[in-house]
């Protein structure tokens, strides 16, 4: 238990993913990012074309394995790289790139099942969209949830439909709520992704997104900073002056405010975002990940604050 917050080690003031995993498994857990070779429904014409305007050619899997290689090969290569830094640990296989339930169940099984048989794999994390959860897929996920440690990561990005339309998400909020409900019916852990710094969004709008997530039946959150990569459709918006990058100070203050309204039990899987430096358009300060994390820690300490301090349910209890 931390000095300031019950769901953290040492001086952390928010519910870290690392804390959660070490408490659950008693050791270091690596998240091994894989590319299952999927597409997205707003890229392939199922619901739209072009994809999300912020999304890279790698489908937001810029640090995932090589999709040209079999899943087992990707897994072993990334595992070996991780063990160059850490000597021991077990693994969560993370299907990160594109939409990882956008295929028939038979295809999903071909992708997921082999990696679950790898030595040391204790769980599975699947990144997808709320409009790619048909009943048969949810039933398969429910079955997986009975035999491995499962998370489904659902991209929300923003609760504001005007922004969602601008970035070509091609789904509405009701679809998101429905997706969460389908998964939670089977007690599947859900991690919601949000992005700070989207075009046209101000502080109040970004806080509204965090406050809405705080009310959802989701067990985790990933807070991303919008970082612009070369080759993404959003570069054109940036060149037209439709996008301004957040400063590090503004981002730090916003994230601390967002943490304060989240329930303390909600696991914070990520609290910033970065991309390959050779593809980065901006903001360049985001590549210094540890500095960003340290500034968030320092600001929470300066405020004598912590995750959930302003959460209504936490205050009432």
Predicted features along the sequence, with ranges:
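A contiguous, low-structure linker/loop signature
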Residues: 77-118, 123
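Hydrophobic faces of well-ordered beta-strands that scaffold small-molecule active sites
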Residues: 30-34, 91-93, 124-126, 150-154, ...
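Auxiliary Fe-S-binding modules of radical SAM enzymes
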Residues: 2-19, 28-30, 220, 228-317
């Amino acid at each position: 238990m931390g000095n300031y917050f019950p769901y953290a080690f040492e001086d952390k003031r928010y519910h870290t993913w690392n804390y959660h995993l070490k408490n659950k498994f008693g050791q270091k857990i690596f998240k091994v990012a894989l590319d299952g070779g999927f597409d997205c429904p707003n890229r392939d014409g199922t619901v739209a074309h072009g994809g999300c305007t912020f999304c890279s050619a790698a489908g937001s899997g810029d640090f995932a394995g090589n999709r040209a290689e079999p899943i087992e090969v990707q897994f072993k290569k990334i595992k070996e790289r991780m063990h160059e830094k850490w000597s021991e640990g077990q693994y969560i296989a993370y299907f990160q790139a594109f939409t990882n339930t956008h295929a028939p169940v038979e295809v999903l099984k071909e992708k997921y099942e082999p990696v679950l048989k790898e030595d040391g794999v204790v769980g599975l994390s699947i990144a997808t969209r709320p409009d790619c959860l048909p009943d048969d897929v949810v039933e398969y996920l429910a079955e997986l949830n009975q035999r491995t440690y499962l998370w489904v990561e659902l991209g929300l990005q923003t609760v504001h439909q005007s922004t969602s339309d601008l970035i070509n998400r091609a789904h509405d909020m009701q679809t998101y709520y429905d997706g969460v409900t389908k998964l939670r019916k089977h007690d599947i852990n859900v991690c919601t992704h949000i992005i700070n710094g989207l075009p046209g969004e101000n502080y109040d709008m970004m806080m509204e997104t965090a406050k809405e997530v705080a009310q959802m039946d989701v067990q985790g959150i990933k807070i991303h900073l919008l970082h612009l990569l070369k080759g993404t459709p959003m570069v054109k918006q940036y060149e037209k002056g439709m996008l301004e990058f957040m400063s590090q100070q503004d981002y730090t203050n916003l994230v601390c405010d967002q943490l304060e309204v989240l329930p303390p039990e909600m696991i914070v899987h990520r609290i910033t975002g970065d991309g390959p430096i050779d593809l980065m358009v901006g903001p360049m300060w985001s590549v210094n990940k540890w500095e960003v994390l340290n500034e968030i820690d320092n600001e929470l300490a300066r405020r004598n604050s912590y995750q959930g301090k302003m959460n209504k349910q936490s205050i009432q209890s």
